[in-house]
Swiss-Prot record:
Name assigned to this protein: Dihydroneopterin monophosphate aldolase
SUPFAM superfamilies: Tetrahydrobiopterin biosynthesis enzymes-like
Family annotation (InterPro entries): 6-PTP_synth/QueD, 6-PTP_synth/QueD_sf
Cofactor(s) annotated in UniProt: Zn(2+)
Keywords recorded for this protein, A-Z: Lyase, Metal-binding, Zinc
PANTHER family for the chain: 6-PYRUVOYL TETRAHYDROBIOPTERIN SYNTHASE, PYRUVOYL TETRAHYDROBIOPTERIN SYNTHASE
Enzyme Commission code: 4.1.2.59
Residues engaged in binding Zn(2+): 15, 26, 28
Similarity comment: family membership: Belongs to the PTPS family.
GO molecular function: lyase activity; metal ion binding
Catalysed reactions, as listed in the record: 7,8-dihydroneopterin 3'-phosphate = glycolaldehyde phosphate + 6-hydroxymethyl-7,8-dihydropterin
Species name: Pyrococcus furiosus (strain ATCC 43587 / DSM 3638 / JCM 8422 / Vc1)
Cofactor, how bound (note): Binds 1 zinc ion per subunit.
Key word Zinc present: yes
Length: 114
């Protein structure tokens, strides 16, 4: 039987994005929710603490940073894709990233699904 487990994290970072023109550099508290799926083996999908370590390791790269120095045009969508690529590389082979939600403050967010 498959199950999904969920981990939430947050980080503070600054960015400037280009929609039609470049915005001014500004900051947000980003909220992240990661959902992974796998078979229940020995009573669990993946040790919660291992999932926390994977996600927190990625979040640490972004926390209190200027995201424009890490990626081009750090829109919330691009930040979510960047995070997802790094999480996927560090999950056990039998556990898959199914959903990632990233909120920019309390009003706007993006959700990726696989």
């Amino acid at each position: 039987m498959k199950a999904r487990i969920i981990y939430r994290a947050s980080f503070d970072a600054a960015h400037a994005v280009k929609i039609e023109e470049w915005e001014e550099l500004h900051g947000h508290t980003f909220s992240l929710e990661v959902v992974v799926e796998g078979e229940i083996k020995k009573g669990y999908v993946m040790d919660f603490l291992k999932l926390k370590k994977v996600v927190d390791g990625v979040v640490k790269e972004l926390d209190h940073r200027n995201l424009n120095k890490i990626m081009d045009n750090p829109t919330t969508e691009n930040i979510a894709l960047w995070i997802s690529e790094r999480i996927r590389k560090n999950l056990p082979g039998d556990v898959k990233l199914k959903r990632l939600s990233l909120w920019e403050g309390n009003e706007f967010g993006v959700e990726l699904e696989w």
